[in-house]
């Protein structure tokens, strides 16, 4: 087991494969183990670093709120701890929010970026999803102890009794309003957006997000010379809750990360 002491946190990470680095950031209430079905594909030619975020998986919680900005600082510090100058970063849902804030606040440590099932504004979620996020409380956590999600958490958490605290902190984080549109428009790292065709994100917002990255604004020309540096993928037959295990996603990510750098 590997831990990095960063920002007062003992941050757990697991490494797989060798090659150019790729940091993986899981979704809410999960851990790096969520990527298990696609890890062999992602690590075939790369050094994959699967992280457990604050209070998740094998990373114990500390006395600070959950905030995208502080978790982004943890990831930037981890990249430095590992002796890396830069790394590709891929996140899903909560982890994609952290990845997005990492490239915004610490652009010097991010090479290419893959964001899966995440909005850049809070109203990018379907309204009922945004409302449900406000229901994460200690009491909700207690009720969730009968779920497979809790079983996976309790199996690896340093302090399983922190499950209720995690729910309270997640509820607070996910209730905060945010709009990162102006920051997104300034991102220069090649970025791939990936969504399910039955996602928790509004389809119109997916297109708006892509446009902020310079995508979908014009035809790419017959030779593709005017295509944007970023990519947008919508995976058929997937949802917000299973897209990260789709073999098609792993194949798309691998191709995106290996593609020649876009021209000026």
State where each predicted segment sits.
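Conserved HGGG/HGGXW glycine-rich cap/lid loop of the alpha/beta-hydrolase fold
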Residues: 9-60
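Active-site loop/oxyanion-hole signature of alpha/beta-hydrolase fold enzymes
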Residues: 49-90
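Flexible "cap/lid" loop of the alpha/beta hydrolase fold
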Residues: 97-105, 110-150
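Active-site nucleophile elbow and catalytic-triad environment of alpha/beta-hydrolase enzymes
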Residues: 167-183
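Short beta-strand/loop motif that positions the catalytic acidic residue
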Residues: 187, 193-195
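Acidic catalytic loop of the alpha/beta-hydrolase fold
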Residues: 198-202, 240-241
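Conserved alpha/beta-hydrolase "acid-adjacent" motif
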Residues: 200-208, 217
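Catalytic active-site module of serine/aspartate enzymes centered on a nucleophile-bearing elbow/loop
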Residues: 220, 225-264
